[in-house]
Amino acid sequence: MAADARAEAQGLTTRILELRDAYYELDTVLVSDEEYDRMLRRLEELERLHPELQSQDSPTQTVGGRAQTTLFAPVEHAERMLSLDNVFSFEAFEAWAAKIERDAGRRVDYLCELKIDGLAINLRYENGVLVTAATRGDGVVGEDVTENIRHIPAITQRLSGAGPFPPVVEVRGEVFFPVAKFEELNANQQAAGERVFANARNAASGSLRQKAEGKNPAQRRLMRDRLGRLRMLVHGIGAWPNPPVATQSGVYELLRSWGLPTSAHGRVFGTVQEAADFIGRSAERRDTVEHEIDGVVIKVDELVLHDELGATSRAPRWAIAYKYPPEQVNTKLLDIVVSVGRTGRATPFAVMEKVKVAGSEVRQATLHNQDVVKAKGVLIGDTVVLRKAGDVIPEVLGPVVELRDGTEREFAMPTDCPECGTPLAPAKEGDIDLRCPNAEFCPAQVRGRVEHIGSRGGLDIEALGEVAAAALTQPRFPERAPLPTEAGLFGLRLEDLFPIEVVVRDSETGLPKLTETGVEKVDAPFRRRRQKKDGAFDPEAEAFDGDEIAVPSKSAIELLANLRAARTKPLWRILVSLNIRHVGPVAARALADHFGSLDAIRAASRDELAAVDGVGGIVADAVLSWFEIGWHCEIVENWARDGVQFAIPGHPGPGRADTGGGVLSGLTVVATGSLEGYTREAAQEAIVAAGGKAASSVSKKTDFVAAGPGAGSKLAKAEELGVRVLDAAQFTILVEQGPGALPEVAE
């Protein structure tokens, strides 16, 4: 196999997984659906030509994102939640339908329904009572959002109708904000000075995936208000062995009789042409529907054909999503500004008159680089054509030349970094993008890296978001930022946070907000006015307590507490937070599991790094290059000095985690459900640290299954195969003392 094919496949895998993590974990869309599908199809082609490239965890074999946040307990779906394959033209849809009818050996009926742009949810009912609600996650395990789901008016807690109800049934659907409710939400956010949501899907995901714990009464009321604006429509079933109906449309009728909300827009058609006509009509009236839609889902209506046609590892063959081309509007290009991201890339952004497109208001869009600006032919002051690529990402298509009046002017790419003044330059010869080479101290790059450290894919620090990162790295006062680099992050003190003042900026344009008198608005995020309950200022007190006027705010105290807790986060999260190029959650987990410590990773050769399953040559080169830079090593030294743990306790050493050297040497253990005292990732790391293999599925080779509440098919499989099942307490004994310390199994 050619080395370039392997390198291309590794690069595609890394990028696709990064995009999935951004979409499913961070509620962020980085590329259009068409571009994502192009990358996925290319990876499928490479794996077809070179079967040895395909692995079980390849993006071509998996669904969704990894349910890796620590905010919610993991829930295993009784039946996998698959994704859908996409088509973008009538020709592609007709080709899919022709294959369906060829494989079925007869003409089929098609159920067509509007594709809701929302958050996929799985509702589990037992004997008619809602027991759990979970996000899709990776299709096998999602996040438990049951308590939040109960606040959504459309979701029934107990099925109605005559019954009898099945012992267990999973109902799948989409949670979304109706267009009107989304507009109300953003209006409230703007009035409160809060960041507005980019689109309704982000808002739905962000509202559903929040915790009430730690919030004050006002915050909890706001949270319940958001949840109360959400709606849900169900569009399928999961685990239900023998539904008493013969068609998918019949399933919907049954679900409606149980009091569950289904779409009023679905129709069954007997020919491909009728289905195609429905797709066309729905596109014309998409703005009249209560919720955002980005296409039509077409399903074979007959349930028996679902079994006959089957599914791939990630999508059913009996259904397809027809994705609409994005909507286009005209608006005024007011300016082109350049921003610098955490990698140093200088990116021009179009600042426009606010305009509504594809369901949300837009004021800015990326222009990528100076060559793209030139190729599009846009001038500052132009009326431009704007669309949302994939109905999500704002994209300037070009100018309306006939509307020019002579006042327009060309954009000139700055020669120096707008943030630190360093001359911009390509990273290497031939690159189009310009970058700021001052990676260590450029405040915009430091801000981006600090924000990445706090992200869900990094250390998952709730108090270290966009606002806190900007305050720590680019304050108005003091002149010297508390964090000139991220090296000092874990050494921050209340005294460092207390004096910080920041300019309040518009969440969309990044421009300073002004008071009525035209002065920039200023905020002090880490202090508040002293109140009677705080007591008098004591300058002799040992603990820092502010000054006579103010005390540290809750945000300051929470940030420091979160940072203390983050010092002992799993090694793979620490690795991601170091901002090593190409080292996302997948590669970081592989490196952490294999080597067990940062010292061992640092000491490894290129061949040793590249040989690790899930790493490869591209990541290996990036890791070695990262450690060659002196200030990177200073970050590690400072973090270690401030208590960050760069090793998995008890790990037997490089390559020995699953081959010997621990109490679970040679044993395979599966953890499923909510194990008390363990997150999903912590349970897996405990198995690996003890020398065992942490498997994701149960088989005859499995030695133990640790199961907590919410365990599903894995528990049933273990009982079927006679594999010993442990509770959380027994699991702790197993990983700490080994199987010999477990109590005898009662006969």
From Swiss-Prot:
Q: Does the keyword Transcription apply?
A: no
Record-annotated active site: K115
* Enzyme Commission number(s) from the entry: 6.5.1.2
Record keyword Magnesium present: yes
What catalytic reaction does the record list?
A: NAD(+) + (deoxyribonucleotide)n-3'-hydroxyl + 5'-phospho-(deoxyribonucleotide)m = (deoxyribonucleotide)n+m + AMP + beta-nicotinamide D-nucleotide
- Which cofactors, by name? Mg(2+); Mn(2+)
Task: Give binding positions for Zn(2+).
Answer: C417, C420, C436, C442
Output the Pfam families linked to this UniProt entry: BRCT, DNA_ligase_aden, DNA_ligase_OB, DNA_ligase_ZBD, HHH_2
Q: Which InterPro entries is this protein grouped with?
A: BRCT_dom, BRCT_dom_sf, DisA/LigA_HHH, DNA_ligase, DNA_ligase_AS, DNAligase_adenylation, DNAligase_N, NA-bd_OB-fold
Q: Please name the top-level EC class of this enzyme.
A: ligase
Instruction: Please name the GO terms that the record assigns under molecular function.
Output: DNA ligase (NAD+) activity; metal ion binding
Report the record's Gene Ontology biological process terms. Answer: DNA repair; DNA replication
For this UniProt record, give its keywords in alphabetical order, as a comma-separated list: DNA damage, DNA repair, DNA replication, Ligase, Magnesium, Manganese, Metal-binding, NAD, Zinc
Where does the BRCT domain start and stop, copy by copy? Answer: 659-747
- Family (UniProt): Belongs to the NAD-dependent DNA ligase family. LigA subfamily.
Its biological purpose = DNA ligase that catalyzes the formation of phosphodiester linkages between 5'-phosphoryl and 3'-hydroxyl groups in double-stranded DNA using NAD as a coenzyme and as the energy source for the reaction. It is essential for DNA replication and repair of damaged DNA.
This chain belongs to the protein called DNA ligase
Species of origin reads: Leifsonia xyli subsp. xyli (strain CTCB07)
